[in-house]
Amino acid sequence: MSINKNIARLRRAKSTRSHIRELGVARLSVLRTGQHLYAQVFTADGSKVIAAANTLQADVKDGLKNGKNSDAAVKVGKLIAERAKAAGIEKVAFDRSGYRYHGRIKALADAAREGGLQF
């Protein structure tokens, strides 16, 4: 039985999100596309976005050739940490949305940790 790559990723993401929901902490969710990277911090119940950052924003785009490399992920990670801390969030659960913890996803997570978020 063959499974589409995206369907398998979404299945992994669904499982991860159910575990995070049981923890009852804010969730740092990441979406990776071919051209850009998006990060959002949701409330513990998932009903409201507390902070958001992505590679389309002007303050992230400055000094970058494109939004699809690890340098862009580092900028997004630092920015999301700064915005989450400004909103009063110190501790989050990292939701990698079924992506491998490698490359841009790892760079974003490491930058968010350096920015002061605790996973």
Swiss-Prot record:
Record function comment: This is one of the proteins that bind and probably mediate the attachment of the 5S RNA into the large ribosomal subunit, where it forms part of the central protuberance.
Membership in a protein family: Belongs to the universal ribosomal protein uL18 family.
GO biological process, one term: translation
Identification of the protein by name: Large ribosomal subunit protein uL18
Source organism of the structure: Xanthomonas oryzae pv. oryzae (strain KACC10331 / KXO85)
Highest taxon above the source species: Bacteria
Record Pfam families: Ribosomal_L18p (PF00861)
InterPro entries, per database record: Ribosomal_uL18_bac-type, Ribosomal_uL18_bac/euk
GO molecular function: 5S rRNA binding; structural constituent of ribosome
Keywords from the named record: Ribonucleoprotein, Ribosomal protein, RNA-binding, rRNA-binding
SUPFAM superfamilies tied to this protein: Translational machinery components
Cellular component GO terms, alphabetical: cytosolic large ribosomal subunit
Family matches, as PANTHER family: 39S RIBOSOMAL PROTEIN L18, MITOCHONDRIAL (PTHR12899), LARGE RIBOSOMAL SUBUNIT PROTEIN UL18M (PTHR12899:SF3)
Classification via Gene3D superfamilies: 3.30.420.100
NCBIfam families to which the protein is assigned, alphabetical: L18_bact (TIGR00060)
Assembly information from the UniProt record: Part of the 50S ribosomal subunit; part of the 5S rRNA/L5/L18/L25 subcomplex. Contacts the 5S and 23S rRNAs.
Name of the encoding gene: rplR
